[in-house]
Amino acid sequence: MNTLDEDHKALDALVLIDEPTFPGCIIHARPIGLFKMFEEEGPDHKLICIPVEDPRWNKIFNLHQVDAGLVKEIELFLTAYARFEDHKMDLEGWEDQNSALEIVREAQARYWELHSETVNPDYSSLNPR
């Protein structure tokens, strides 16, 4: 929430959950990695997150801890998604949790700068370690 990626759209996030949801559903989640994509307007980062409240994921802190088959499935989904876009998109690949956290911080700063609100957000909740 309250993020702008470099293309000035909200930062995209995919949350790994087992239960169905609905559009507009808010899930308290933390990033564990990201998939870097570039389109004509600039970077189009896709955060990969896990739900904070789900005990099945509470020992996962980085993307390399997730089943390799699931990571490959996500990559194939994002690759197929990129093919259906109306413009050229370059796929850069996976980055770790530290990169994801940095992208979130930058996107939040960009959002608040654009909205001229002065805040000093506390990012400690993004990294539970």
Regions found by a protein language model. Give the residues of each.
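Hydrophobic N-terminal alpha-helices or hydrophobic patches in metabolic proteins across all domains
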Residues: 2-129
